[in-house]
Structure formats: C-alpha cells, structure tokens
Amino acid sequence: MGDEKSLAHTRWNCKYHIVFAPKYRRQAFYGEKRRAVGSILRKLCEWKNVRILEAECCADHIHMLLEIPPKMSVSSFMGYLKGKSSLMLYEQFGDLKFKYRNREFWCRGYYVDTVGKNTAKIQDYIKHQLEEDKMGEQLSIPYPGSPFTGRK
C-alpha cells in the first residue's frame, strides 16, 4: 500500500495511462521538438501537482503514466495539458502555424485507462514503446517502384 497519497481527508492512488497524438497523426516529434514537448509537458504537470511516473514521446503520439489527484478530473486535466502545451509549442516553434490551423496542435480525443496493480507492466510497456514503433516501421516492406504504374 506504499503507493497511496493523501489529501486533507482522503487517501488516494489514482494512476492513469494516457495516450494522445498531434492533429492528423503527423510525425512531428523529432530532435528539438521532441525535447521541447517533453520539457513543456513536465512543466505543465508540475504546475498542477500531477506526477509523471513514466512517459515516452514517439514520432506521432505520446504515452504518459500519470498520478492525477482525485480533486481533478482526467478530462479537465487533459484539456489543460493539451491546450497550454499547444500554445507553448506555437510560441516556441512559429512554423507550426502553417501545418496546423487555428492553433489546434493536438487531436480532439485521447486514450485513457486506469492502472490498478499492474503499474510496473505499464511502465515497462511505455518505456519500450519507442523501440516497438521503430520495429513496426522496419517490418513494412519497401516497394522498389511506383505502386500505381508498376515501373521502377
């Protein structure tokens, strides 16, 4: 039971596996942008007292294992996280406004799952997610020619 936290009259252990992606599932996170989105998300979680247990920024989506206090709903936190990070990314990278209109950097939805006793398994899954994505890309068979004309 060592995972429990406490508020004034509450003992809690609320962990969530959250996955969200940029609009149009574009592969946007490489190099400097990958580091920037990581530091922005860390900063925003810190401001709301949300603890990041594990996180991975893949090329076209982000996995996070978070401890969100029960006084805050997951949907309100995700609205805050995606909204503020979008503004901060647009401020830092001016070229994003040409790819994404109306300052909407993230997809509208997200995936969330509660984490029970299998925290270690989900942490391991998130830790190795980037490697699995790369393996999936390598499994695709390159076609030497044009798929439409059949010529090389």
UniProtKB/Swiss-Prot annotation:
Q: Which domain of life is it from?
A: Bacteria
Active site location: Y125 (nucleophile)
**Keyword field:** DNA recombination, DNA-binding, Endonuclease, Hydrolase, Magnesium, Metal-binding, Nuclease, Transposable element, Transposition
Sorted alphabetically, which InterPro entries does this protein's record hold? Transposase_17, Transposase_17_sf
Q: Which SUPFAM superfamilies match?
A: Transposase IS200-like
Q: Binding positions for Mg(2+)?
A: H61, H63, Q129
GO annotation terms (biological process): DNA transposition
Q: Provide a Gene Ontology MF annotation, just one.
A: DNA binding
Cofactor(s) the protein needs = Mg(2+)
Q: What else is known?
A: Belongs to the IS200/IS605 insertion sequence (IS) element family.
Q: Which family does it belong to?
A: Belongs to the transposase 17 family.
Sum up the protein's function in the record's words: Transposase responsible for transposition of the IS200 insertion sequence (IS) element. Transposition occurs in 2 main steps, excision from the donor DNA 'top strand' into a single strand circle and its subsequent reinsertion into the DNA target. This increases the copy number of the IS.
NCBIfam families referenced in this protein's UniProt entry, alphabetically: transpos_IS200
**Subunit record text:** Homodimer.
Q: What is this protein called?
A: Transposase for insertion sequence element IS200
User: What organism, scientifically named, is this protein from?
Assistant: Salmonella typhimurium (strain LT2 / SGSC1412 / ATCC 700720)
